[in-house]
Regions:
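Alpha-helical residues within the helix-turn-helix
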Residues: 16, 27, 56
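Residue-level signal for the short linker/turn that defines the boundary of a DNA-recognition helix
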Residues: 9, 19-20, 46-49
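A short, Lys/Arg-rich alpha-helix, primarily the initiator
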Residues: 1-17
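DNA major-groove recognition helix of helix-turn-helix/homeodomain DNA-binding modules
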Residues: 49-64
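Short alpha-helical DNA-recognition segment
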Residues: 20-35
Length: 68
């Protein structure tokens, strides 16, 4: 399995729909703003736990936010 494959995501759009800043989302899910930036730019795959927390915070299903 190739661990270099990055998930694509729609986090930025979903976050903006909820009128949340990157800092707001980071606080809600217990991470840093820089981590949210990296995930939104598809430079970093979140852990399963962090992905789930993001889905909960943005009130979206996993498949609505993440794709290959």
């Amino acid at each position: 399995m190739n661990s270099d494959i990055l998930l694509q995501n729609r986090i930025k759009e979903a976050r903006q729909e909820k009128k949340l800043s990157q800092e707001d989302l980071a606080k809600l899910v217990g991470t840093t703003r820089q981590t949210i930036i990296s995930i939104e730019k598809n430079q970093f795959n979140p852990s399963a736990r962090l992905a789930l927390l993001i889905c909960i915070a943005l009130e979206k299903k996993f498949e609505e936010l993440f794709y290959f």
